[in-house]
UniProtKB/Swiss-Prot annotation:
Residues 589-591 form a propeptide. Residues 1-309 are annotated as: GTPase domain (Globular). GO terms for biological process: activation of innate immune response; cellular response to interleukin-1; cellular response to lipopolysaccharide; cellular response to tumor necrosis factor; cellular response to type II interferon; cytolysis in another organism; defense response to bacterium; defense response to Gram-positive bacterium. It comes from Homo sapiens (Human). It is found in: Cytoplasmic vesicle membrane; Golgi apparatus membrane; Cytoplasm; Cytoplasm, Perinuclear region. One of its GO terms (molecular function) is molecular function inhibitor activity. GO terms for cellular component: cytoplasm; cytoplasmic vesicle; cytoplasmic vesicle membrane; cytosol; Golgi apparatus; Golgi membrane; nucleoplasm; nucleus. This is Guanylate-binding protein 2.
Length: 591
């Protein structure tokens, strides 16, 4: 169970200092500690429209984000408040309150546009807050939406036409919620009641015509319809008599307009119930560290004069996380091998079987923690590191076996060596006595368990080192005839040749086992990669089908409204999505 992060109040995430956007390191520390998936709700709107009040309500607090009580905008840059999600256990709600747009004292439309774009890029639900009704003035104030293609890139290498790039916006843009404060109209058309959502859709209807006025009317509406196919609207009555509005957060509930209280409750309930976890392309859920990386990547891009690019942000994040995934996988492998392996192992195959089990688990850890591993670069690194660690364990195993056998030989054959020095076998019949004793000790050595894979080789080398002793005893033993000595020499040669042959077979067997293990390792990498790619492909297809359904829905609306040309333009986006879905075939080229 991941620990909860519950900030007592908001803190600055991105400062707007002298026209420069600067990330607050303390806020990044908070984000880096949030291991839970995050639901990110951002609110944007003109200054002094009561954005902060709604965000405090979402946090379940009366105070928090600064409301201010004058015509001056209080919030500067983007402020963040992280609280446990009240309706989704094991999730963190991240609320982003933004600097009021259109502040006359600030007079910086450039920064307003960047704050608007950042709020969209960072959130899973984007709330646009405005006063009164949705009229042309309200649409004109929302001109930032028409500038999104000049502020955001979906891909690092889009086509020649920026509109082609913007066609991908839908796949990672947030849900759009328009909140209308101090709304005084009756929600009805031709005497029939309508919902706030109906009112929004009616307000987004296009005007026929190709003149400049029609274009100005249609452009923001088209952008909202194109970029935010999932949209919602809430209207709010006056919260209280005008004289109390400056101190809204201090009012008791009974002093507020009951309709306003009900409307705020409905808004909060919807946002908390329907706002999704922030995701990256392919449905990858965002947690605190991932959100931290997105903030840094986007703000750094803006500061360096580039456009924030979703693809670049994801790839930068993938580099960080995939590198960490390799480290996690290797740590898991070493932990498992440390627990399971007792050196020396009786056979090489015993060690390789333990390696294979630990390797399989390590690859699983990597697959679970990695994403967007372009050309399987990090999986290749993992494979190389696992192979190096396997070889290291093999070396350790050989050394442990050699050390064990050398100590055992000293223990078993030490007394025999002492007898040789004392001349015990330097007498007639001594050679026979020596070879008999040697065979007894060899049998004793063979019977000792868990000597490891070097047992035969260490014994062979030891016996070879004592051949001069045996030969001297043979040649000086007066009880043996020259013929018997010659026969014994030939027997020793044959025995040595047989031992060498067996050693060669043993080495060949080890090489075959290593080659077989390498093939099994490769197949395990391929198997798990194929399964992951299939899961990713299914996720991407589901995401594209969802986007396609929303595009088709919008196309149908345009046709019903009689805007055939706009429908045809949208058809290109639809074809692009359909072609991409067809091309989503798993490709597996690794190692």
């Amino acid at each position: 169970m991941a620990p909860e992060i519950n900030l007592p109040g908001p803190m600055s995430l991105i400062d707007n200092t002298k026209g420069q956007l600067v990330v607050n390191p303390e806020a990044l520390k908070i984000l880096s500690a949030i291991t839970q998936p995050v639901v990110v709700v951002a609110i944007v709107g003109l200054y002094r429209t009561g954005k902060s009040y709604l965000m405090n309500k979402l946090a379940g607090k009366k105070n928090g984000f600064s409301l201010g009580s004058t015509v001056k905008s209080h919030t500067k840059g983007i402020w963040m408040w992280c609280v446990p999600h009240p309706k989704k256990p094991e999730h963190t709600l991240v609320l982003l309150d933004t600097e009021g747009l259109g502040d006359i004292e600030k007079g910086d439309n450039e920064n307003d546009s960047w704050i608007f774009a950042l709020a969209i890029l960072l959130s899973s639900t984007f709330v646009y807050n405005s006063m009164g009704t949705i009229n042309q003035q309200a649409m004109d104030q929302l001109h930032y939406v028409t500038e999104l293609t000049d502020r955001i890139k979906a891909n690092s290498s889009p086509g020649n036409n920026s509109v082609d790039d913007s066609a991908d916006f839908v796949s990672f843009f947030p849900a759009f919620v328009w909140t209308l404060r101090d709304f005084t109209l009756e929600l009805e058309v031709d005497g029939e009641p309508i919902t706030a959502d109906d009112y929004l859709e009616l307000s987004l209807k296009l005007r026929k015509g190709t003149d400049k006025k029609s274009k100005s009317f249609n452009d923001p509406r088209l952008c909202i319809r194109k970029f935010f196919p999932k949209r919602k609207c809430f209207v709010f009555d006056w919260p209280a008599p005008k004289k109390y509005l400056a101190h809204l957060e201090q009012l008791k509930e009974e002093e507020l307009n009951p309709d306003f209280i009900e409307q705020v409750a409905e808004f909060c309930s919807y946002i908390l119930s329907h706002s999704n976890v922030k995701t990256l392309s392919g449905g990858i859920p965002v947690n605190g560290p991932r959100l931290e990386s997105l903030v840094l990547t986007y703000v750094n891009a803006i500061s360096s004069g580039d456009l924030p690019c979703m693809e670049n942000a994801v790839l930068a994040l993938a580099q960080i996380e995939n590198s960490a995934a390799v480290e996690k996988a290797i740590a898991h492998y070493e932990q498992q091998m440390g627990q399971k392996v007792q050196l020396p192992t009786e056979t090489l195959q015993e060690l390789l079987d333990l390696h294979r089990d630990s390797e399989r688990e390590a690859i699983e850890v990597f697959m679970k923690n990695s994403f967007k591993d372009v050309d399987q670069m990090f999986q290749r690194k993992l494979g190389a590191q696992l192979e190096a660690r396997r070889d290291d364990f093999c070396k350790q195993n050989s050394k442990a076996s050699s050390d064990c056998c050398m100590a055992l030989l000293q223990d078993i054959f030490g007394p025999l060596e002492e007898d040789v020095k004392q001349g015990t076998f330097s007498k007639p019949g001594g050679y026979r006595l020596f070879t008999q004793k040697l065979q007894e000790l060899k049998n004793k050595y063979y019977q000792v368990p868990r000597k490891g894979i070097q047992a035969k080789e260490v014994l062979k080398k030891y016996l070879e080192s004592k051949e001069d002793v045996a030969d001297a005893l043979l040649q000086t033993d007066q009880s043996l005839s020259e013929k018997e000595k010659a026969i014994e020499v030939e027997r020793i040669k044959a025995e040595s040749a047989e031992a060498a042959k067996k050693m060669l077979e043993e080495i060949q067997k080890k090489n075959e086992e290593m080659m077989e293990q390498k093939e099994k390792s490769y197949q395990e990498h391929v198997k798990q990669l194929t399964e992951k790619m299939e899961r990713d492909r299914a996720q991407l297809m589901a995401e594209q089908e969802k986007t396609l359904a929303l595009k088709l829905q919008e196309q149908e609306r345009l046709l019903k409204e009689g805007f055939e040309n706009e429908s045809k333009r949208l058809q290109k986006d639809i074809w692009d999505i359909q072609m991409r879905s067809k091309s989503l075939e798993p490709i597996c080229n690794i190692l």
